[in-house]
Amino acid sequence: MCGIVGAIRAHHNVVDFLTDGLKRLEYRGYDSSGIAVYSDGKIKRVRRVGRVQLMEDAAREKGISGGIGIGHTRWATHGGVTEPNAHPHISGGMIAVVHNGIIENFESERKRLEGLGYRFESQTDTEVIAHSINHEYAQNGGRLFEAVQEAVKRFHGAYAIAVIAQDKPDELVVARMGCPLLVALGDDETFIASDVSAVIAFTRRVAYLEDGDIALLASDGIKRLTDKNGLPAERKVKVSELSPASLEPGPHSHFMQKEIHEQPRAIADTAEVFLDGGFIPENFGKNAKSVFESIRSVKILACGTSYYAALTAKYWLESIAKIPADVEIASEYRYRSVIADPDQLVITISQSGETLDTMEALKYAKSLGHRHSLSVCNVMESALPRESSLVLYTRAGAEIGVASTKAFTTQLVVLFGLAVTLAKVRGVVSGEDEARYTEELRQLPGSVQHALNLEPQIAAWAQQFAKKTSALFLGRGIHYPIALEGALKLKEITYIHAEAYPAGELKHGPLALVDENMPVVVIAPNDSLLDKVKANMQEVGARGGELFVFADLDSNFNATEGVHVIRAPRHVGELSPVVHTVPVQLLAYHTALARGTDVDKPRNLAKSVTVE
């Protein structure tokens, strides 16, 4: 991990693209960066720990320029955060490699290569790739494509790699297995990247590589491509919908703030498919109706924020569609003994569509005999939709901040639409209820905007939170996952320890933490559980805890000493979890501002998790 770029340019200096592309990948998270460029007859390399700008300044100072090169932002997995461990890695002055992923058998490969006389300068698994390719390159008489083909046969794990050779200044070879990689085509220039955001300022014509692909590139495009079976293949070139403007924060201080405020638009765009065409199976794929008619239960697999969206969906699926639903963390599911049901729909959720644990969990489910799969993700042409029989994309647009915001709320919209659609197919929803759900969905962007208007009040709360070291979030029923999401957001970007519990579990342990120094955030909409939540709040107040309550206009809460209340719009029915997500996002954002942390790029975290 975490970002790859590369290019062959016939008429321009490749360093301009490499540094610009790496800066556009900074949002994915990293600890060091580097580039390798064919310059003045040899491969020249610059690596630095810290920001890409430090590395760029060093490259400019050295006067590095050329027409072919590769670059990388690293998020340490094997080996510490040091310059020798940063990419690119070079073998024998001949082969330079950048790599995302993890080579699981790197220790045995390292011993094999050491036995062949190769010396290692780093602790990384990537240096194994460089030496292995160099060895094959020397053995086959200098054929780079074939050297990569042979080398990758030895690797176990996930990888996306880009390779250049000192004596092949017009060839760039790439390979993909389990980690994202694309090829972008310009005029007499060809680019590669792990994310389309890196290339969008230079071209919008992209081809997404698939697992097992190996490609030979020149400045005029893809010269050779083989698939996982070693057979010649082609990958369709598409015009990306992403615009350069979407990759800038505009008038906002941070991408996270921008993306929080983009939620009314993102939700409206995502809901459009249901509002225009209705809750019909065809929204999810051509054969969705027959799949939905045949399934008896649902299994949802996801990680991180997407897992909390899945937990929310469980309530909708069981209450609206009347279908049993089970939710699991993908990284846990893929390593346990599972009883498979071929009539169960497996749903996977991932913002990027490339989350490795989620992808591998889906493959595992299919290997056990699951016949039906549906993915919910935000990135067109990503791996997860290609592996799934059905798909519905969120329309959140590019999300740059590491802490997910609009991707989460648009996932909720899609999952709500799925629940109502399944209810229709199963004949368990009345026309009156369907009309009510449609109207709630239509009004949702406006309700979210009303919640955004609470920002000044929430920012005032944040000044108090900034001085705390821990926080507790409480919710009940379908709002418990929103409490989980609020706690995750706070810990991600403020580094304040935060936990979330169902409010009814207070007496089973968490109440021991409550004192005057522990802020307790309560999600308290005016639903059937409101009186229960109020009773739980009394328990907190009796122990001297300070309560911060996100309520509805009609929840009948009064602010008193030790009880702070902010009222969201009037209760909006089944979609209340979406509206109540916004205040906890804003609380985390403004607390991070008050503490002076890096909002968009919090420490130790990556946007797209493409390794275990």
UniProtKB/Swiss-Prot annotation:
Main location: cytoplasm
Gene3D superfamilies: Glucose-6-phosphate isomerase like protein, domain 1, Glutamine Phosphoribosylpyrophosphate, subunit 1, domain 1
Record-level GO BP terms: carbohydrate metabolic process; fructose 6-phosphate metabolic process; protein N-linked glycosylation; UDP-N-acetylglucosamine metabolic process
Pfam families given in the database record: GATase_6 (PF13522), SIS (PF01380)
Enzyme class: transferase
Active site: 2, 607
GO CC list: cytosol
Domain SIS span(s) in chain numbering: 288-428, 461-602
Keywords: Aminotransferase, Cytoplasm, Glutamine amidotransferase, Repeat, Transferase
HAMAP family to which the protein is assigned, alphabetical: GlmS (MF_00164)
Assembly: Homodimer.
UniProt name for this protein: Glutamine--fructose-6-phosphate aminotransferase [isomerizing]
Organism the protein comes from: Neisseria gonorrhoeae (strain ATCC 700825 / FA 1090)
